[in-house]
């Protein structure tokens, strides 16, 4: 655990037993849980279990995020009421979380009385504080369905490349972004009708108010992750810059959600009541269990509050949510922990490749959920780095670490102990130097978990497992067992091995709770806590007969998993239709296909797979940023001087000024396109392009992130 993380976790905590409220982001109630979702829930669950093993009072809260236009339209498409749809999805989500050992104390729904009351009270408090404003805005309106349309529910012809059937905010062919009013020949994806412009009164949370800005500037200093702090400071801008915009918190009927008090026909936008759903789920638990809800959530509470989220929703959880709480009289989050995205075999999850893997398909294929918990934990740390599920590595790591190293220790010793020594350990063996080394390591392993450095915790654990196996290999109990004269040595070897196995099981318990339960039953002990490192096995308590704890991953299981999730490209199109397209829109697809093909050819952009030969044409190189400066006269560009292992450095202009100060970049490694034709610009010659990532909807999720290779990469190395 880093010093900064330790400080952030404990700064506001009372001494001794802490009170801790923990949440994961709420899954949306219109789809299945997939392995990308599970990264977050497994990460949170491991942290929660770690804290519980310290004896703290911890509540892990979740709920389905149920409101909004997509849920309303999907329910209509399936011939259900929204309530029927979200009830069904809740059952599916709860089943999946239970399957993967996600130990919510309460998993609830944002469509609840508790959430309605809390959302209304927070809104009214903000209004009383002068932080709610009314404004007339003009929006696209479907005259057939008689509803206002979000940008993603409008399609038409791209105003830049003229590709057909593009969304109202960006073109998937040429990558342009634009306003819905700029679309050519627009139509509603709900009815196929041509939208009209219509004015409506909306309600805004005045995030631009100086009080909000002042509060957020102070609050951001407590965030544990430097990446999160940097993004917050980017969004806030410099003092006096007034970069924060007011937030539209209302939607017009018809809308599935909560009606705003005193505003008939106006509903809370889903992103207002969704985070309030954390509190609503906790309130439901408190009422049921007799917990003092107000003591946990009021301003000044000594209880701690942590949110685990994906980095794509950092904006909502570090700007809107803390400000809403602060100015409605509630305690603010102690910290927000963001994680990166999941790729599978180095690429975005794909239905056509079978790597868009649902939680249920994983279980149905017969794969052990604790294999995935272990693999994710072995990749996770306290940063926002993306992680990759490499299926070959998954199989190799599980088979090597969990079966070959860990489980193998118990299977090699238990039989001898039961057969020769009545299942009772040798008490003097509990003081063996190897046992002492493992016992002393437990505290640092627990600290790694609490600091969210799971990969370090598991790396340390497996290094210890290697030492235990080396000890067993050196002692050769199978040879000792051949001669009765070696009984004392055999007894010691088996006893040391099993106590070491107990300690390794303790170290792995937050990650593999079901295996830990089986180990506890095997030893006949109470549920293991961190303090039990100092409570060794005793001859007074014989072990039970050994039951096999884990099997190896069979390659055929991986093949079956991919096959179960593999889908045709036609089914992908059908899935897009289910997300909003109607029969009327589907009829346009064939007509638009040829036009889009021309637009693709003209713009050189296509989502279809490319050949390896096409990819090989792009020369991607590791580049070191040796100098960086702002470009005078440009509010978007930075001028980068890049070392890519050539005799001369490269000069590149990059539109990343909104995300980085020049001094932040100097010395960093990044990735550049080295064989891009030089481009003469107003400010000079640009000799390549650095790679950066951003959200598809940059208005809702602002931010740019340059690619940074792992340490060890050197300037000039090819990316391949």
From Swiss-Prot:
Annotated Pfam families: Anticodon_1 (PF08264), tRNA-synt_1g (PF09334), tRNA_bind (PF01588)
Motif ('KMSKS' region): 348-352
Catalyzed chemical reaction(s): tRNA(Met) + L-methionine + ATP = L-methionyl-tRNA(Met) + AMP + diphosphate
Enzyme class (EC, first level): ligase
Keyword ATP-binding listed: yes
Free-text comment on the cofactor: Binds 1 zinc ion per subunit.
Co-factor(s): Zn(2+)
InterPro entries to which the protein is assigned, alphabetical: aa-tRNA-synth_I_CS, Anticodon_Met, M/V/L/I-tRNA-synth_anticd-bd, Met-tRNA-synth_bsu_C, Met-tRNA_ligase_1, Met-tRNA_synth, Methionyl/Leucyl_tRNA_Synth, MetRS_core
Binding-site positions, Zn(2+): 158, 161, 171, 174
Family: Belongs to the class-I aminoacyl-tRNA synthetase family. MetG type 1 subfamily.
Subunit structure: Homodimer.
UniProt name for this protein: Methionine--tRNA ligase
Species of provenance: Burkholderia ambifaria (strain ATCC BAA-244 / DSM 16087 / CCUG 44356 / LMG 19182 / AMMD) (Burkholderia cepacia (strain AMMD))
């Amino acid at each position: 655990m880093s010093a900064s993380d330790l400080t952030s976790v404990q700064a506001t905590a009372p001494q001794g037993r802490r009170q801790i409220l923990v949440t994961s982001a709420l899954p949306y109630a219109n789809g299945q849980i997939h392995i990308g979702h599970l990264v977050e829930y497994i990460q949170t669950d491991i942290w929660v279990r770690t804290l519980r093993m310290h004896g703290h009072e911890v509540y892990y809260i979740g709920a389905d995020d149920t409101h909004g236009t997509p849920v309303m339209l999907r329910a209509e498409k399936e011939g259900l009421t929204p309530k029927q749809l979200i009830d069904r999805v809740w059952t599916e989500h709860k089943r999946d979380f239970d399957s993967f050992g996600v130990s919510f104390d309460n998993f609830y729904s944002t469509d609840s009385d508790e959430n309605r009351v809390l959302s209304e009270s927070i809104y009214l408090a903000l209004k009383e504080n002068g932080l709610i404003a009314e404004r007339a805005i003009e929006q696209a309106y479907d005259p057939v369905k008689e509803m206002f349309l979000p940008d993603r529910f409008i399609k038409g012809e791209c105003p830049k490349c003229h590709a057909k059937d593009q969304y109202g905010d960006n073109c998937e062919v040429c990558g342009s972004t634009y306003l819905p009013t700029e679309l050519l020949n627009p139509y509603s994806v709900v009815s196929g009708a041509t939208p009209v412009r219509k004015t409506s009164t909306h309600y805004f949370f005045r995030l631009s108010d100086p009080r909000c800005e002042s509060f957020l500037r102070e609050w951001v200093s407590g965030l544990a992750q430097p990446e999160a702090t940097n993004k917050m400071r980017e969004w806030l801008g410099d003092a006096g810059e007034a970069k924060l915009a007011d937030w539209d918190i209302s939607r017009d009927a018809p809308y599935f959600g909560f009606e705003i008090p005193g505003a008939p026909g106006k509903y809370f936008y889903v992103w207002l009541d969704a985070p309030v759903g954390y509190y609503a789920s906790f309130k439901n638990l408190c009422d049921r269990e007799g917990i003092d809800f107000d003591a946990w959530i009021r301003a000044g509470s000594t209880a701690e509050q942590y949110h685990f989220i994906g980095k794509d929703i950092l904006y909502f959880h570090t700007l809107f949510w803390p400000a809403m709480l602060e100015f409605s009289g509630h305690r603010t989050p102690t910290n927000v922990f963001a994680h990166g995205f999941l790729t599978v075999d180095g690429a975005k999850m794909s239905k056509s490749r079978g790597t868009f893997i649902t939680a249920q398909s994983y279980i149905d294929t017969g794969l052990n959920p604790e294999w995935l918990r272990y693999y994710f934990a072995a990749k996770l740390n306290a940063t926002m780095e993306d992680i990759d599920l490499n299926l070959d590595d998954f199989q190799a790591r599980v088979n090597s670490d969990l079966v070959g190293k860990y489980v193998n220790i118990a299977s090699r010793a238990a039989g001898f102990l039961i057969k020769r020594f009545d299942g009772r350990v040798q008490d003097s063996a509990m003081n063996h130097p190897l046992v002492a080394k493992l016992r002393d390591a437990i505290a640092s392993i627990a600290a790694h978990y609490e600091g969210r450095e799971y990969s370090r915790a598991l790396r340390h654990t497996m290094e210890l497992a290697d030492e235990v196996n080396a000890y067993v290999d050196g002692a050769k109990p199978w040879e000792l067992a051949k001669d009765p004269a070696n009984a004392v040595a055999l007894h010691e070897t088996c006893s040391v091995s099993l106590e070491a196995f107990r300690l390794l099981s303790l170290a792995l318990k937050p990650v593999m709770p079901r295996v830990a339960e089986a180990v506890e039953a095997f030893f006949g002990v109470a549920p293991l806590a961190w303090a039990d490192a100092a409570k060794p096995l005793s001859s007074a308590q014989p072990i039970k007969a050994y039951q096999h704890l884990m099997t190896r991953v069979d390659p055929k299981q991986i093949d079956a998993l991919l096959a179960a999730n593999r889908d045709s490209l036609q089914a992908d199109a059908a899935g897009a239709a289910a997300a909003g397209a109607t029969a009327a829109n589907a009829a346009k697809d064939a007509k638009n296909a040829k036009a889009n093909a021309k637009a693709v050819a003209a713009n050189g952009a296509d989502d279809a797979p490319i050949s390896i030969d096409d990819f090989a044409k792009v020369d991607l190189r590791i580049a070191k940023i040796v100098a960086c400066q702002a470009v005078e006269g440009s509010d978007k560009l930075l001028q980068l001087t890049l070392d890519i292992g050539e005799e001369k450095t490269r000069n590149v202009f990059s539109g990343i000024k909104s995300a980085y100060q020049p001094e932040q970049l100097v010395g960093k490694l990044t990735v550049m396109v080295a064989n891009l034709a030089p481009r003469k610009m107003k400010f000079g010659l640009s000799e390549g392009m650095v790679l950066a990532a951003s959200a598809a909807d940059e208005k809702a999720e602002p931010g740019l992130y340059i690619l940074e290779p792992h340490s060890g990469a050197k300037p000039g190395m090819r990316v391949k």
